[in-house]
């Protein structure tokens, strides 16, 4: 899914400055917004062409997280949050979820686990086994999002077949303590730099709409840009009941689109993915994410909430005259051009789940 963020840019394409970004981030209506979207789309086409990549995930371990990230229903600290709670699923189920995502058009597949980090050797071993099987049995590019990681652990995962590591900054440094207090911004940077040092492709973004200012959205983008990440997943807050941020009002579709466009102009070479919250925040304007500069999005369900049916996501891409980008693993891709409908997807997903554990408060 992701190429290096140092991709050579076409003539005439240069990143905009932070000062210009802070001006443009306020262009959220009328001709100013239209011009901003046109500019972002032109950069996307010039650098990335007309291909869109899809990413699928599995929530491999859910709930009971000791962190206090204010947006997340998986925290054990929040009374009333109702995320599912279960231990690490088996490698076989992870691989089956990857097969489903691949058939739905996913280029990359990410193994996501709740918690500060993997707490047990057995969990790491399960992910290693799953990665080996993903490389052997599917065409998808394996990714993992497992919290804070050290170099030895990341090396084991890379040796097992990991291609991408995902770890979000979540928000600007100046706003981070308003969102999370149980780990630091710098701890997140350490994980990202460790992954980069091993040559893994980096996926790091965050969530917009968590009470930050427009200027802090630009600050966040500057920090992501300076890390030299390959992929920037952009989420929009979908407030979850029982969390500290549940009271926040969704930002407008125009604010979402302006932020995406500014991010594209700041980071022309990065792959920008629109992920969680697009249905809630953009509604019937979801198709405009590509005009705003995105060249990737998610297919299937999110961690703790349902996404669109895969055929609707693929249809959204095709309506814009865009095509799906296949994996770069050199293996035959299982996607045949026909993503499953909602009914088909739900029927295939109705498989036995691990027995839920009691929530620990």
Curated annotation (Swiss-Prot):
- Which Pfam families has this protein been placed in? BATS, Radical_SAM
**What SMART domains does the annotation carry?**
BATS, Elp3
Question: What cofactor(s) does the depicted protein rely on?
Answer: [4Fe-4S] cluster; [2Fe-2S] cluster
- Asked if the Swiss-Prot or TrEMBL record annotates the protein with the keyword Metal-binding, the reply is yes
| Keywords, in A-Z order | 2Fe-2S, 4Fe-4S, Biotin biosynthesis, Iron, Iron-sulfur, Metal-binding, S-adenosyl-L-methionine, Transferase
InterPro entries noted in UniProt? Aldolase_TIM (IPR013785), BATS_dom (IPR010722), Biotin_synth/BioAB (IPR002684), Biotin_synthase (IPR024177), Elp3/MiaA/NifB-like_rSAM (IPR006638), rSAM (IPR007197)
Positions of the Radical SAM core domain: 47-278
List positions binding [4Fe-4S] cluster: 65, 69, 72
Q: For this UniProt entry, which residues form the secretion signal? A: none
Named in its record, the pathway it takes part in is: Cofactor biosynthesis; biotin biosynthesis; biotin from 7,8-diaminononanoate: step 2/2
Has UniProt tagged this entry with the keyword Membrane? no
**GO annotations under biological process?**
biotin biosynthetic process
EC number(s) per entry: 2.8.1.6
Describe the family membership recorded for this protein in Swiss-Prot or TrEMBL: Belongs to the radical SAM superfamily. Biotin synthase family.
Give the protein's recorded name. Answer: Biotin synthase
């Amino acid at each position: 899914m992701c190429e290096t963020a140092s991709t050579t840019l076409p003539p005439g394409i240069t990143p905009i400055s932070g000062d210009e970004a802070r001006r443009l981030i306020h262009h959220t209506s009328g001709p100013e917004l239209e011009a901003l979207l046109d500019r972002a789309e032109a950069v996307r086409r010039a650098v990335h062409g007309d291909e869109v990549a899809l990413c699928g995930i599995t929530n491999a371990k859910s709930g009971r997280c000791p962190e206090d990230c204010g947006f997340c229903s998986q925290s054990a600290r929040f009374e009333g949050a109702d995320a599912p709670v279960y231990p690490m699923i088996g490698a076989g189920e992870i691989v089956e979820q990857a097969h489903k995502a691949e058939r739905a058009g996913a280029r990359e597949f990410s193994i996501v686990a709740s918690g500060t980090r993997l707490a047990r050797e057995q969990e790491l071993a399960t992910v290693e086994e799953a990665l080996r099987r993903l490389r052997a049995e599917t065409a998808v590019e394996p990714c993992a999002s497992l919290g804070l990681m050290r170099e030895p652990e990341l090396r084991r995962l890379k040796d097992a077949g990991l291609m991408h590591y995902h770890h979000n900054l979540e928000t600007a440094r100046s706003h981070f303590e308003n969102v999370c207090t149980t780990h630091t911004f710098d701890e997140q940077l350490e994980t990202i730099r460790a992954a980069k040092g091993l040559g893994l492709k980096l996926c790091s973004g965050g969530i917009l709409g968590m009470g930050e200012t427009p200027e802090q959205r630009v600050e966040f983008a500057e920090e992501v840009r300076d890390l030299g990440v390959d992929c920037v997943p952009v989420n929009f807050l979908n407030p979850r009941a029982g969390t500290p941020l549940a009271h926040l009002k969704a930002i407008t579709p125009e604010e979402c689109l302006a932020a995406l466009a500014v991010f594209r102009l700041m980071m022309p070479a990065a792959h920008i993915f629109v992920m969680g919250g697009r249905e809630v925040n953009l509604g019937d304007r979801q198709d405009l994410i590509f005009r705003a500069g995105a060249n990737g999005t998610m297919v299937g369900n999110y961690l703790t909430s349902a996404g669109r049916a895969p055929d609707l996501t693929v249809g959204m891409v095709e309506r814009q005259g865009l095509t799906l980008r296949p994996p770069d693993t050199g293996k035959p891709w299982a996607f045949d051009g026909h993503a499953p409908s909602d009914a088909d997807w739900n029927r295939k997903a109705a498989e036995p789940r691990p027995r839920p554990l009691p929530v620990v408060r």
